[in-house]
């Protein structure tokens, strides 16, 4: 009977991870004092498709809240997440309440500094005890009275530890975490999050703490609790010490690669071997993947297969959808989309790319094609009550449109030469069009 029960519980753990790969297991609010290990940890949380960062608050700690806010806002904007809510000071508790009120999934509150903001949120946010399932705090031990995060706000720490929400603590034990081999491995990961972590470390090469993992233990514990040793304390909390540093190093690389969920539904991954791709595309495969990331590459391949030919507007739609997900810091199947590309090719081919890159399909009830004229290369993306319009810059839209008209005029749609030239153009723009440069983004009231 006991074996049967254990098997059932294990099955329950496995099924959610495999049945809904587009829905992350961890919805989090982060509170940070803006220190360098906080910023590295935030990069890790943003890199993981198994985490949805709902909001970040800035608090007094290593830095004062206004300085922490600027560091965090600069970080997330530099990672193209301009739509991710960040607040500090008196606005922090308000943002926490707004975020919890809008979220239906239980939330983990990750505190990577003193607990003053968290303590205030417990008082000021009616939804806190209802929506927050656990607090994950980084501190040197538990109660950890010698730790900076405890000493900065001891009364707040005592209040949180005595509260009704479970508190899990980690932090110490990561000295010398970023060794030379680790830095080389991070340098070989082609994601903006890995690049930013390496930049942060290289910004202070003479400071030993920059090579230490402290707040980074929070995302590691969230994803890989089996690599820690847990011990209950007298404070009703659990302290988690790193048990396998080499394993945690490999786990960090896995997070920075975005390998925390199975993204595909039929095959495991897109082939890395360029011989799997058509000869005319082979010379550009590595460049496109490394420059724009695995999400854009995978969506581009699937989108063009769905489309049944390589088309520049389908590729523009892929890039537009990925850019929208970046902006809101969200995943697939989480946005409502209204496209303004109409239903007439070639412009309407953009709709296919948007569907693949966002998961906003008619079958999911998330995609609407506007019938309002004139049609143009743009779409409205709505997430958590906020709508942003992303439009292809006019000069680029005019250029793409005129090129296609010219090819059509000279060769005609029934000509093999027409489709070959369209294919060549599509590969060219797939490589040349940087989604961070080709679009205009504006709020829709």
Regions found by a protein language model. Name each.
Residues 260-310, 316-445:
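Non-transmembrane, aqueous-exposed alpha-helical and coiled segments at domain scale
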Residues 33, 59-63, 287, 307-312:
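A short N-terminal beta->alpha junction/helix N-cap motif
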Residues 20-276, 362, 443-444:
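N-terminal acidic, glycine/proline-rich low-complexity segments
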Residues 13-18, 289-292:
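Short, motif-level signal for alpha-helix interfacial/capping segments enriched in acidic residues
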Residues 4-14:
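Sec-dependent N-terminal signal peptides
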Residues 83-84, 312-314:
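Surface-exposed patches in mature extracellular/periplasmic domains of secreted proteins
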